[in-house]
């Protein structure tokens, strides 16, 4: 856990405070929104098992979600719609969701730590951290909030569009998902720009 705080502690020691971590879930799927979360944890907060959301089981993420919400000084969660993804492109839509999440914070961050290698569209001072969801506590927390929130949304979509199996693959391009699209056609929440390469 202390390793997850090493970068943030350096920045805090330089007098920059508070920091927020920002991450997204849902850039790659063929269907559904992209979700982003921004989190400001108390400096040095210990949340056991906090790590990159992709390495955690669904049950563990759900438990950590509640602990993060209860521990955070501030958090924001937001979406960009399928229409916005199609109109702009997935990268611009991701930045839109990230900015919306940051805007929802009840505390304005002095610096946003963004998972990945691009931050040109972020509306507050920011810094990229490649692999940040495994390196920074605030980003790891944001990763979990975004992933759990988007997964819950896709479970709702699975009830609305039961023929696609969204509850299993959450909209990602599995063989079963492609087969369902070929059989019944795309739904209203499919990203048509992502389906153009289908044969």
Question: Where are these predicted regions, by residue range?
Answer:
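RNase H-like, Mg2+-dependent phosphodiesterase core
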Residues: 1-199
